[in-house]
């Protein structure tokens, strides 16, 4: 495999056209000399933009021989600079400039896209992923989990909960195309790599609610990634104890390409779990993004992904001590058997964009997603449950003994084909109308065959004196072949108020029709933003709307018992879950001890109807398959972003949240939803050694309330048990070597490299035993069930290397 990747990268490098890339860089200051962070820097002719960093620094790369660069900020006059370059060699220009306050003509202020947060989306700086210590292989989701309102109690998974929503309530878009994840994944160990490849990503936006009408039919969040077009030849390789990555890209005036490879093997990390055995998880992924401009008004693009995830596991032993100091128990298991899982996915999208004028933009996209998933296991375990009389582990009397046998043969094939059109027209300088419509065909074939037998002291559980029965058995076969028609229209308008400031409105409506249940939903949405001229360092926003989540395949499965056998059928009476949302927020930019900071605060309330109740076991979500509940979610999210030490970004997030539901038949009693967490604190802190700023320390901290738990067979309303608080600290130490700063980088073996990153990480620094779920042990001697905790990963070390050409 390594030889194959090397040959492929070499061939691609030899066949690409390398063009000279010109660079303009410098700092932006106010008239009083203060550095200005978050200034919009754009090339209007190329629809390219960025922001100055927290020190006011910027960098512009272009392959053109001349370019206009625009600098703009609310409350300041827009500056436009023209640069010309030699077409024979690369040029490097330094340009520092000052922005003047604009006290009269606010029309010069350029407010576009998400640069000034007039929507509910926030930009993510994906460069932090290179140094952020995480248990994943550089997934963008690791960065998302540090945002306010986002929670994840499993470092092995890329899934997250946003403001009390389930893992299935989050949309992910790549270049405007919605992407999907495997259906049958039950644990974080199986999950592997997410779809998004950070090496290919350019602009990343995340919204925790109140998003525009153009985004799909989910209730909680939107993660939007735009894959970039390289300006020049570029390449990079990286590796760690948990995997490897590689990418290569190039471009010329009409053509651009970028390819990415990822490999992950988490056996190094899974070895810290309490169940010892032979872990062999292998995850491989290839992606490409290619663009071609046959005409200055037309651009074609192709996005593709191929991935294969295999998870092979042969458990051997497990020993877990749990309980309180007055009632310690030891759960010991000896295993035989194995698990073999395979997930294969393929995705392709071909799009065309036509811009007849500067005001009009028309797009057409055809895409397809295919997944082939297999889960197979036969695992037998013999267990003993003993009292523990001391923390040293001295065993006492035996409280339970038995064995169990778990069997599964589950498979699923799914094909999703979509044709979509979108467009926009700039009616005036301050008014843009956009729209879109798509037709989606969904085909799913699923066969489930799984059962579990338990034997306690020679008796099957549940105990029956005459006919021994299985503890759990599910057999089903379902087929789905339906279509969806969806569309939206929205208008974005802004104007300059007479008394100063800018007001921005984004009003739209979205509709959805699904042939499976013949349901039509209409979703009106509104986002308002205000940028006061009197106080330009404060910005306000408000969003409201009626949001629907059209059921997915997992949500329409209703479980019933027929002749003592559990099975599932597809419930055609299912309706979309509905959420009426109100969100208000503000951003405050300020300097403290000459360091720039940004404070963001949002409060929200979501009234939930037609809830489809569900239960969570590890990462597996099982829906009731009926709209049998109503509820609410309310909370406060706070994030402080800035330089706690000069020149290095850090941020602190804090959330208070409560989400409750009332299920039909429970006397209108409200109980916590499966993702209810009262508090969640996250911190990403960076520092460096005084006098040696190139040596940096990175700390990722998370502390969240435990999730509600219920025993198998218990009503959801009786749930009063929670997992312990989730606590985790990951530590990283890094050193970046750069050409031009480190003299030896331009010599010998290191001459081809532009940058080298070396990082050492300690994952789960303090060795916290975080509980992911519980295994419930039943005994014949008593009716009690023992909740044996399933712990997540322990302390582990990791070394990362990254080379950029």
For the regions a language model picked out, list residue spans one by one.
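Periplasmic N-terminal accessory/gating domains of Gram-negative outer-membrane beta-barrel systems
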Residues: 75-77, 86-87, 93, 116-170, ...
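Periplasm-facing N-terminal accessory domains of Gram-negative outer-membrane beta-barrel systems
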Residues: 19-108
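Surface-exposed extracellular loop regions of Gram-negative outer-membrane beta-barrel proteins
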Residues: 534-582, 603-623, 700-714, 769-773
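C-terminal beta-signal and adjacent terminal beta-strands/loops
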Residues: 650, 702-712, 735-805
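Membrane-embedded beta-barrel scaffold of Gram-negative outer-membrane proteins
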Residues: 361-367, 573-627, 632, 757-761
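Face-selective signature of the C-terminal outer-membrane beta-barrel domain
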Residues: 293-309, 338-517, 600-603, 651
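Gram-negative outer-membrane beta-barrel transporters
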Residues: 497-499, 605-607, 624-711, 802
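Transmembrane beta-barrel wall of Gram-negative outer-membrane proteins
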Residues: 236, 240-263, 276-316, 339-368
């Amino acid at each position: 495999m390594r030889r194959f990747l090397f040959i492929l990268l070499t061939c691609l490098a030899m066949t690409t056209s390398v063009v000279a890339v010109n660079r303009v860089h410098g700092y932006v200051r106010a008239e009083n000399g203060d550095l200005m962070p978050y200034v919009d820097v754009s090339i209007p002719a190329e629809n390219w933009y960025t922001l100055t960093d927290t020190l006011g620094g910027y960098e512009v790369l272009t392959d053109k021989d001349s370019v206009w660069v625009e600098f703009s900020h609310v409350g300041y006059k827009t500056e436009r600079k023209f640069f010309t370059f030699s077409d024979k060699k690369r040029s490097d220009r330094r340009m520092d400039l000052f922005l003047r306050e604009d006290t009269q003509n606010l029309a010069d202020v350029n407010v576009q896209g998400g640069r000034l947060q007039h929507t509910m989306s926030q930009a993510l700086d994906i460069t932090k992923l290179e140094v952020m210590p995480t248990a994943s292989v550089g997934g963008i989701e690791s960065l998302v989990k540090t945002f306010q309102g986002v929670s994840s109690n499993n470092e092995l998974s890329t899934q997250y909960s946003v403001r009390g929503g389930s893992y299935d309530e989050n949309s992910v878009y790549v270049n405007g195309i919605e992407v999907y994840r495997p259906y049958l994944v039950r644990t974080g160990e199986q999950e592997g790599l997410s779809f998004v490849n950070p090496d290919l990503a350019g602009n990343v936006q995340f919204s925790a609610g109140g998003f525009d009408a153009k985004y799909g039919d989910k209730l909680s969040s939107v993660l939007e990634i735009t894959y970039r077009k390289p300006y020049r030849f570029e390449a990079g390789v990286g590796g760690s104890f948990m995997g490897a990555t590689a990418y290569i890209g190039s471009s010329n005036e009409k053509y651009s390409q970028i390819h990415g490879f990822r490999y992950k093997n988490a056996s190094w990390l899974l070895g810290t779990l309490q169940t010892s055995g032979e872990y062999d998880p292998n995850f491989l992924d290839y992606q490409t993004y290619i663009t071609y401009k046959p005409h200055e008004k037309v651009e074609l693009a192709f996005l593709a992904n191929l991935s294969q995830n295999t998870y092979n596991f042969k458990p051997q032993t497990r020993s877990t001590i749990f309980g309180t100091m007055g009632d310690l128990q030891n759960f010991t298991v000896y295993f035989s058997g194995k698990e073999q899982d395979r997930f294969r996915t393929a995705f392709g999208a071909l799009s065309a964009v036509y811009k007849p004028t500067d005001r009009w933009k028309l797009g057409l996209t055809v895409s397809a997603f295919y997944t082939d998933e297999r889960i197979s296991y036969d695992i037998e375990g013999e267990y003993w449950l003993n009292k523990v009389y001391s923390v040293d582990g001295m065993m006492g009397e035996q409280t339970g003994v038995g064995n169990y046998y778990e069997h599964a043969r589950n498979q699923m094939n799914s094909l999703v084909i979509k044709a979509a059109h979108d467009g926009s027209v700039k009616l005036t300088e301050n008014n843009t109308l956009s729209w879109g419509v798509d037709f989606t065909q969904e085909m799913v074939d699923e066969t489930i065959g799984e059962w579990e037998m338990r034997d306690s002291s020679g008796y099957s559980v549940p105990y029956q004196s005459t006919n021994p029965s299985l503890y759990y058995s599910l057999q089903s076969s379902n087929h789905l072949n339906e279509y969806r028609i969806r569309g939206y229209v929205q208008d974005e308008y802004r104007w300059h108020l007479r008394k100063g400031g800018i007001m921005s409105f984004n009003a739209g409506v979205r509709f959805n029709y699904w042939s499976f249940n013949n349901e039509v939903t209409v979703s009106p949405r509104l986002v308002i933003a205000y940028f006061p001229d009197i106080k330009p360092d404060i910005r306000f926003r408000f969003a409201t709307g009626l949001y629907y989540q059209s059921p997915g395949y997992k949500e329409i499965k209703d479980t019933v018992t027929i002749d003592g056998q559990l099975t599932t059928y597809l419930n055609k009476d299912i309706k979309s879950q509905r959420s009426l949302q109100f969100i208000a927020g503000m951003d405050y930019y300020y300097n403290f001890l000459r360091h720039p900071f940004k404070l963001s605060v949002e409060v929200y309330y979501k009234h939930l109807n037609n809830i489809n109740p569900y239960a969570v076991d590890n990462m597996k979500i099982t829906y009731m398959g009926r709209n049998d509940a109503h509820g609410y979610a309310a909370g406060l999210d706070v994030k402080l972003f800035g330089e706690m030490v000069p020149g290095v970004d850090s941020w602190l997030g804090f959330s208070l949240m409560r989400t409750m539901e009332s299920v039909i038949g429970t006397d209108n009693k409200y109980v916590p939803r499966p993702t209810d967490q009262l508090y969640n604190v996250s911190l990403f802190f960076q520092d460096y050694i005084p006098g040696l700023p190139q040596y940096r320390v990175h700390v990722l901290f998370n502390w969240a309330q435990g999730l509600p738990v219920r025993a198998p067979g218990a009503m959801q309303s009786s749930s009063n048990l929670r997992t312990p608080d989730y606590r985790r600290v990951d530590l990283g130490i890094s050193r970046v070597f750069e050409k031009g700063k480190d003299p030896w980088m331009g010599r010998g073996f290191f001459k081809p490299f532009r940058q080298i990153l070396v990082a050492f990480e300690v994952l789960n620094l303090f060795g916290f035993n975080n509980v992911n779920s519980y295994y419930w042990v039943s005994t014949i001697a008593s009716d009690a069930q023992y909740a044996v905790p399933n712990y997540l990963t322990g302390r582990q070390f990791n070394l990362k290397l990254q080379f950029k050409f």
